[in-house]
């Protein structure tokens, strides 16, 4: 999830090597070099950025390996990473699940091409350590990095390991996870997060003195969550106006017009936005958050210490969002509602029965569940392996 805007790093000159994507050349001499591999979704990219920024602060020269995108649509990482001042490398490879039989037929050729491109990148960048944070792009690059003798540090963000990390975990030098029990031999450290999530005041301090309508934050992510966009306005319309919360509803830019129409049709006032500038602050300000249960979202909410109603994305691979949410929900740190069980009447009833006292207790429970030193642990592993 996490579509918050981060500040860019120091500017660096740009060149375009033949046959490759734009690369920002870093001029520091003698620095240790890290190759960070992550792509596809914000759940992989934003933890990778947290690690990359921490490595840069420690004097490392950081290159990022991601995908180029397809069908005229650039990859998310190619849009997010270069503006933050990191050298960006790319190869041609993307997911295979749900793409049809032809994708599997041509997979061997695509893999060979991606293996060769990965070898070229690793030889050019000469990393002291390679850090993989998931996404299909990490498979060919991770395997070739190991083949070329480069130390590999792996981090799995979800409570159910993805296909790529299941394979790479067998050859990595260090394996970390955001949730417990993902791999038999791994270190549970939590998710790498920006410091802003960790530095928020504790829930008791934030809730002290709050009065009036509840503050409800609905988070749909970069693409929006159509089910939430349709259901929440209808649920609010069923509540007496005096009992309605103050609502901020974030949806992706592609769905913002439809979201405005939904609220207008329901006759409900709300602050509607295509993105959130400061997600950590928005989480801290909310009494209750309604959101999906991507790994970054769950761990960011826990780090802040916020109360959330999780509605897992029903098509998530291996239903990992449900497992992510249960990490908090089973300990009283949130609520879980499957999309198939959602109704406007049920949500309206829940909102009317919810008070700040219960939300504070939920937020306090969530806060106790999150480890907050994941970024430091990953950076320390990189420095140990690079010696």
Swiss-Prot record:
InterPro entries in the record: GlcNAc_MurG, Glyco_trans_28_C, GlycoTrans_28_N
Highest taxon in the source lineage: Bacteria
Gene Ontology CC annotation, any one: plasma membrane
Compartment(s): Cell inner membrane
A biological process term (GO) from this entry: lipid glycosylation
Binding site for UDP-N-acetyl-alpha-D-glucosamine: 41-43, 158, 194, 222, 276, 321
Enzyme Commission (EC) number: 2.4.1.227
Membrane topology qualifier: Peripheral membrane protein
Disulfide bonds: none
One Pfam family cited in the UniProt record for this chain: Glyco_tran_28_C
Protein name per UniProt: UDP-N-acetylglucosamine--N-acetylmuramyl-(pentapeptide) pyrophosphoryl-undecaprenol N-acetylglucosamine transferase
Lineage of producing organism: Bacteria, Pseudomonadati, Pseudomonadota, Betaproteobacteria, Burkholderiales
Gene (UniProt): murG
């Amino acid at each position: 999830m996490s579509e918050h805007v981060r500040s860019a790093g120091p500017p660096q000159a740009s060149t375009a090597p033949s046959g490759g994507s734009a690369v920002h050349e870093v001029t520091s001499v003698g620095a240790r070099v890290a190759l960070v591999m992550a792509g596809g979704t914000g759940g992989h990219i934003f933890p990778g950025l947290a690690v990359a920024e921490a490595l840069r602060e420690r004097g490392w020269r950081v290159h990022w390996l991601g995908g180029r995108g397809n069908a005229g649509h650039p990859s998310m990482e190619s849009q997010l990473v270069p503006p933050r001042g990191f050298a960006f490398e790319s190869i041609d490879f993307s997911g295979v699940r749900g793409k049809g039989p032809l994708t599997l037929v041509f997979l061997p050729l695509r893999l060979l091409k991606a293996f060769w491109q990965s070898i070229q990148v690793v030889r050019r960048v000469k990393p002291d350590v390679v850090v993989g944070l998931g996404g299909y792009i990490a498979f060919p690059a991770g395997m070739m990095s190991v083949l070329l003798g480069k130390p590999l540090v792996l981090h799995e963000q979800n409570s159910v390991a993805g296909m790529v990390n299941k394979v790479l975990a067998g050859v990595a030098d260090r394996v970390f996870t955001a949730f417990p029990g993902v791999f038999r031999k791994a270190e549970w450290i939590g998710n790498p997060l920006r410091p802003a999530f960790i530095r928020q005041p504790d829930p008791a301090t934030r809730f002290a003195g709050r009065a009036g309508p509840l503050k409800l934050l609905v988070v749909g992510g970069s693409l929006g969550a159509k089910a939430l966009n349709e259901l929440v306005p209808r649920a609010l319309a069923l509540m007496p106006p005096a009992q309605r919360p103050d609502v901020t509803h974030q949806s992706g830019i592609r769905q913002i017009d439809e979201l405005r129409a939904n609220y207008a049709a329901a006759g409900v006032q709300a602050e509607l936005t295509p993105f959130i500038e400061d997600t950590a602050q928005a989480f801290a300000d909310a009494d209750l958050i309604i959101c999906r249960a991507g790994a970054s979202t769950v761990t960011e909410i826990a780090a802040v210490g916020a109360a959330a109603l999780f509605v897992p994305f029903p098509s998530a691979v291996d239903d990992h969002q449900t497992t992510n949410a249960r990490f908090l929900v089973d300990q009283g740190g949130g609520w879980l509602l499957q999309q198939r069980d959602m109704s406007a009447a049920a949500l309206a009833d829940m909102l009317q029965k919810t008070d700040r006292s219960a939300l504070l207790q939920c937020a306090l429970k969530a806060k106790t569940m999150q480890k907050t030193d994941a970024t430091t642990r990953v950076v320390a592993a990189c420095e140990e392996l690079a010696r």
